[in-house]
């Protein structure tokens, strides 16, 4: 039950971080203005939204990292529980099966009835009239 709550909080923090980062003004990049951040100076005062959004982004990032650590802890507990049950390690079960080498992978052509007239690899050019 607690793991599901942590997963939901983790997803909400991820979506919140993406939204906040898109809304913020970057140096030289005003992509946030298209999402309504252009009028934020009137809402948040003369400093604008930089400090407010930066603080909220930092808090969401900290909660995101904490939920990530929590999910790692839950994953570790599940793997330890599987080992205590007596299930073998999947890496031990997986064995390499050596492939038997083929005798000859190159197809054999039928032998020609008469040998080539020249000793070179290139056939003779036809005579011109």
From Swiss-Prot:
- Entries under Pfam families matching the protein: SecG (PF03840)
> In what way does this protein cross or attach to the membrane?
Multi-pass membrane protein
BP term (GO), one:
protein secretion
Q: Cellular component GO terms, alphabetically? A: plasma membrane
InterPro entries, from UniProt? SecG
Chain segments annotated as transmembrane: 5-25, 56-76
**Sequence segments annotated as region (Disordered):** 93-129
Keyword Protein transport listed:
yes
Location comes to:
Cell inner membrane
Tell me the domain of life: Bacteria
- Major subcellular site: membrane
Q: Which UniProt key words apply to this protein?
A: Cell inner membrane, Cell membrane, Membrane, Protein transport, Translocation, Transmembrane, Transmembrane helix, Transport
Give this protein's Gene Ontology molecular function annotations: protein-transporting ATPase activity
**Which PANTHER family does the entry mention?**
PROTEIN-EXPORT MEMBRANE PROTEIN SECG
Q: What family does the entry list?
A: Belongs to the SecG family.
> What role is this protein assigned?
Involved in protein export. Participates in an early event of protein translocation.
Name listed for the protein in its UniProt record = Protein-export membrane protein SecG
